[in-house]
């Protein structure tokens, strides 16, 4: 394939940095967030007020991390830096000041790629979308069907305040969902007189009823109001005026307990049209009065008051890494503050130093807990570069302070008009998380307040102004202007061509002349996410299938020789580059040295810059990370140029699969129900071969009976099994291992009780001690095989941190090449997925008029009902591109260039391809897009012409090798004594109630009985059955299943007298072994050997 790419649809597709969400947020945390937190806790005074400890936050510093990123991964360490902050201890009595730099904990640092290395594993902190603090006005229907209104003031942290109206036009207030209190009681408690309130309201007459109601209750003074407030908020405690005062003060006016946050203040000011400075983060009297006023206007339906939509993106904000981390640091500092106060009280005042007061543990614990076990700190999805990039751009509504799956209704999950250009309407998981986990749209960015913005070009007098930077609008701003979509057709000078343009205005569509348009979207791609924007002809696919296509691209396994898509969208380069998988030149200069491990670039000043490449590293998902240089010695490079391909990249573009020749036709039923029929060429030419690296680990522990040993001396193992082990008993790198082979030899000391009777016999006869260790080696599991690519040994002597009780840890990495096989899952980019049902020799595959056999035969019935016609466009465009020997870039939504543009483009290309010499058969005007195929087995033509072409097909990570599993005997569950489930537990297959019905319907009573007893949980019966099979005797009758006994015990525990009786009415105790047929005694005895004095313990 020549690599000339033709851009079919020209639009502005320059994208912002795609990982900026993560990096910018962490940078904010280092520059501001951390300092803010440290300074908000300072000063800390002791209970007597004699000592003060100040944190000088702006003077914090970070030390160089102990390990670099690679080293941290290798040693299972955390890539973190030590934080030091200057503390000042002031003694108020003596005026003495002690200043000292104090260690306050370790802070994990973000790598260049926007990830964190925690205990050697790469993790991503997912962005969370939560309800923004501020004031919200809602309406509710009461029992009589009358509409009432309420207003909630939601802070960043602290108590909620909710005002509501009732059917008698009275105003009430609730604090944190407690009982209702008359609103005027709260006003009086806050020290406001009747006139103070009435002067602020535009419709005071409505409020007077509430004043009268308060007076009727006998609450006419501030003191009485405070008493009433205390009674309602703290029922059961003796009320006092001072208590009420303190309660009110701490709940709403103390910055430590109540914080609106910068965002909350901004939103309240905006909604209520206030001008309170954004440094005032607590409630003010003005906030409360304006909220009341707005609520009354709503009730009376005057003054332009409007309700809020809580699913609008103007009312939801994104909390990224920096803010989540800041909240966690606050938790740690809260704990630290308590400790410092205690130490101040206990210690000797004169000799105290800041270092003695500050204990780094609580802060370290809080940060560790966040990175290690928070719902938002996730193990990075590293299947391929796209998966990695998407994971960093993911936005979740779950997590602490967010929603839960069970509680989230339909409205929260639904697509909202304000998502346009901010959240992708397509990419979201299928299943219980649908709509709760979203992906950021391609051009979206998060502003300083955490609201998502998207860019537009300004339009003046019908002309789109594309000079300068685009203008970013948040969802609130966008509602107030008229916005045209990105695929509006324009003349060369930027003038909008059409007479009437569809625009969005206040979440509705209307048609206006070009002069009234305020903004135009930047690009048609800006609505969708990165993964979705890689799907060509997206506009011809049904949304459900596009969703599957987006999700399945993230599951594509990096192949041995990746190939760029013939038909792409032009965003492939940027995805590869921003994912961090491809090394990029840091300077302008010339390549002076290249090999598989490093690239050296000499800059203009003659300095060398070495870029080391990753070779065959294991990713989080066991796929292989490998980089291959694409520059040569002497090549000039510029800053930002891609110098090597990562996994699933080719030529600096993302390449998730292969372009294969596909025909849509049924073939002997082998592609029934989405199955795929594939050619042997995919196997022999290694088209879909991938490398997987599996990690096996064993530790030698200290046991009660002595240490375990890693050794070559393993009891009862033949010498040939040890052939590949070195003198320590560890497999050598490069050895090929099959299942059951020893990777690391290990012996464990065993006590007396572990010894089998024959050993005891030998010791009784000869009095000698057999070597009392047992083989506990690490072996290759059942279905695995491969080549050992790396062995790592960790010991305490080398300074490695080991788990408690371990003396040595050995890790073995085994790589395997997996060719494609029956049972593997494959998919296209349009949600067309299937399982391989048969691999056919290429001479039997249907072949083209020029003799080329096709690679994959798909079922044509997979297209019409699923409505993902994009695959057919891609197929034919790929066919044309392959015959023209070029690659095509098609930006989605091309109708701006004319109606039915996709069809015209494809047809033009096909006609162009047919003009090539000797290629006339490529396009048949009678049957456009179809060719006459012949059957490879008979050579006869098929009845109908068939759609044939090149499509980009992926091999997904659901490989049959990892799924296939069989069990003969294995572990059982402790309670029910039934076999466990799943491959990892060596489990059995579940025989559910429907399977039981099927056997009952056949009347297969004996088969059914043994499935439910000896093959499952009749403990005694299964042991006897095994014994009988081994000895070749008839299998005895089954007994009682263990789960039946468990059921009886459960009913008995409820106090029901339930038991099993014989015909004669005699009770049978199922818990006893009542089996006279037990021919084998429980243990062998050695009386017959004449060792009568042998002590059988």
Swiss-Prot record:
Catalytic activity: RNA(n) + a ribonucleoside 5'-triphosphate = RNA(n+1) + diphosphate
UniProt GO MF annotations: DNA binding; DNA-directed RNA polymerase activity; ribonucleoside binding
One BP annotation, GO: DNA-templated transcription
GO cellular component, one term: DNA-directed RNA polymerase complex
EC number: 2.7.7.6
Location of the region described as Disordered in the Swiss-Prot/TrEMBL record: 1072-1097
InterPro entries linked to this entry: DNA-dir_RNA_pol_bsu_ext_1_sf, DNA-dir_RNA_pol_bsu_external_1, DNA-dir_RNA_pol_su2, DNA-dir_RNAP_su2_dom, DNA-dir_RNAP_su2_hyb_sf, RNA_pol_bsu_bac, RNA_pol_bsu_CS, RNA_pol_bsu_protrusion
Matches recorded under PROSITE patterns: RNA_POL_BETA
HAMAP family xrefs: RNApol_bact_RpoB (MF_01321)
Family: Belongs to the RNA polymerase beta chain family.
PANTHER family named in the record: DNA-DIRECTED RNA POLYMERASE I SUBUNIT 2
Protein name according to UniProt: DNA-directed RNA polymerase subunit beta
Organism: Synechococcus sp. (strain CC9605)
